[in-house]
Design a protein with these regions (language model features):
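Alpha/beta catalytic cores of nucleotide-metabolism and tRNA/nucleoside-modifying enzymes
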Residues: 1-7, 19, 26, 30-50, ...
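Glycine-rich, proline-tolerant flexible connector loops at the mouths of alpha/beta enzymes
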Residues: 10-20
Length: 193
């Protein structure tokens, strides 16, 4: 702070915990309190941003209420739920979170991700990233129910994207999934970490 820091982001886990266990919101609150005391004495304001275990919009609001932090940084939660920022902003403003995007909109997010990778990096890198990320994206796909009321899953889609050689292969797989194909297998559920 004394060296000119304008904000502090704190992840409420130790290095040893990595991604396991539950974020320590009490620890974040203690940092918020200590920074606040220091700043009041120095006559300036340095906001503390809390991070960890923000997977749903309500988690962001709970983080702010529990810790007193000025804002929330969202990390891994956004990998499977890219619209989490939109939802969290609504909930923090006291509004209801918007409905989850429809399947076509979710697939368009994957297409945009791939498009941005291609725009800013080369095709090899983009294809490596989309093959890695499809499992994260897949956690929110395939939530439609079959005739028995069970989630249909998207394992065949994930497998097809992982085997894709070119962007056109990814787009073809997404098109087929949207049309009702590449369904089945177990739904991937987000591990509680």
């Amino acid at each position: 702070i004394d060296a000119g820091g304008q904000a502090i982001t704190i992840h409420g886990r130790t290095t040893q915990q990595k991604f396991s266990g539950v974020v320590n919101r009490d620890g974040i609150a203690r940092v918020v309190e200590a920074v606040g005391k220091h700043c009041r004495g120095a006559g300036h304001n340095v906001p503390v941003i809390g991070n960890g275990d923000v997977r749903e919009a309500e988690d962001a609001l709970a983080m702010m209420r529990k810790t007193g932090c000025a804002g929330v940084m969202i990390g891994r939660g956004a990998l499977s739920t890219p619209w989490l920022f939109r939802d969290a902003w609504a909930v923090i403003r006291g509004e209801a979170a918007p409905p989850e995007p429809v399947l076509e909109a979710k697939l368009n997010i994957i297409r945009r991700y791939l498009g941005l990778m291609l725009q800013f990096r080369d095709e090899r890198y983009a294809m490596t990233q989309i093959r890695r990320r499809i499992s994260w994206f897949g956690k929110r796909l395939g939530k439609e129910l079959d005739h028995r009321g069970r989630p249909v899953g998207c394992k065949p889609l994930r497998e097809r994207v992982r085997a894709a050689v070119a962007p056109a292969d990814v787009h073809a797989a997404l098109d087929e999934f949207l049309a009702g194909g590449l369904r089945g297998g177990e739904m991937e559920v987000e591990a509680e970490v």
